[in-house]
């Protein structure tokens, strides 16, 4: 094969690889408080690899963006895979998980009984989750170890029990526990957030701008530390 032929073949190969990579995408879901609404919000970017049964997600506390001044802090994250509920208090079993290293929050993974989901979700049974504080249950939690407004954290979960579920089903099965919710939110100081409607375009623009700003700030901090 001539040089030109090899060059064209190489370019074609790169285009095929690039095209295949472009088809891989993560889902984004928007969480809002069941009782406090825009006082307690989060954006979750999630991705599921069905070949390895591995689920990864990054959650950002956007409460102070959707409601300036909000102090709502994420202290627990749980998933109840469909259908809602389970005969066992621990739901589906066989999952393992961990939080990516973080300087701002400290979540602990659990595949056991995470307790009830308050604020109107009594029928939910969490299959796995991440909690803060000594209680080890979803309804409790430690504000000091949680995710403050503007902060993000990443997690990974794997397990054969994911078999048969789609990325969309898993992403939408999230429950987020908020503590230190402003009383003006109307939920008596705490709340649980679930996936809701897509925010208005103006809100999405603000979220995107804020997340980009946070990323730039983090990169500047890393450069300074180096």
Identify the residue ranges that each predicted region occupies.
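Short, charged juxtamembrane terminal tails flanking transmembrane helices
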Residues: 223-226
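Bacterial N-terminal signal peptides that target proteins for export
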Residues: 1-11
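Sec/Tat signal peptide C-region and signal peptidase I cleavage site
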Residues: 20-26
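A short, hydrophobic C-terminal helix/tail in secreted or cell-surface proteins
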Residues: 200-219
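Short A/G/S/P-biased low-complexity tracts
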Residues: 26, 218-221
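Bacterial N-terminal signal peptides
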Residues: 10-19
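Mature extracellular "passenger" or substrate-interacting domains of secreted, surface-exposed proteins
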Residues: 27-197
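Compositionally biased, low-complexity segments enriched in small residues
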Residues: 4, 19, 198-199, 205
């Amino acid at each position: 094969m001539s040089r030109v032929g090899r060059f064209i073949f190489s370019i074609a190969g790169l285009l095929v690889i690039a095209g295949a990579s472009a088809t891989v995408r993560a889902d984004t879901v928007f969480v809002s408080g069941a009782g406090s609404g825009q006082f307690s919000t989060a954006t979750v970017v999630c991705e599921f690899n069905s070949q390895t049964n591995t689920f990864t997600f990054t959650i950002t506390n956007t409460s102070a963006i959707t409601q300036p001044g909000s102090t709502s802090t994420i202290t627990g994250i749980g998933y109840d895979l469909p259908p809602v509920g389970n005969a066992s208090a621990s739901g589906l079993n066989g999952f393992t998980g961990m939080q990516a290293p973080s300087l701002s929050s400290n979540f602990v993974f659990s595949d056991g009984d995470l307790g009830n989901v308050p604020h109107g979700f009594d029928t939910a049974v969490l299959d796995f989750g991440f909690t803060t504080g000594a209680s080890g249950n979803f309804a409790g939690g430690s504000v000091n170890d949680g995710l403050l407004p503007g902060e993000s954290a990443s997690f990974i979960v794997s397990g054969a029990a994911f078999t048969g579920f789609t990325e969309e089903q898993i992403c939408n099965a999230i429950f987020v526990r908020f503590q230190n919710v402003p009383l003006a939110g109307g939920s008596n100081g705490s709340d649980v957030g679930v996936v809701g409607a897509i925010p208005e375009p103006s809100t999405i623009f603000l979220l995107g701008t804020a997340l980009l700003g946070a990323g730039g700030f983090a990169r500047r901090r890393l450069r300074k530390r180096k």
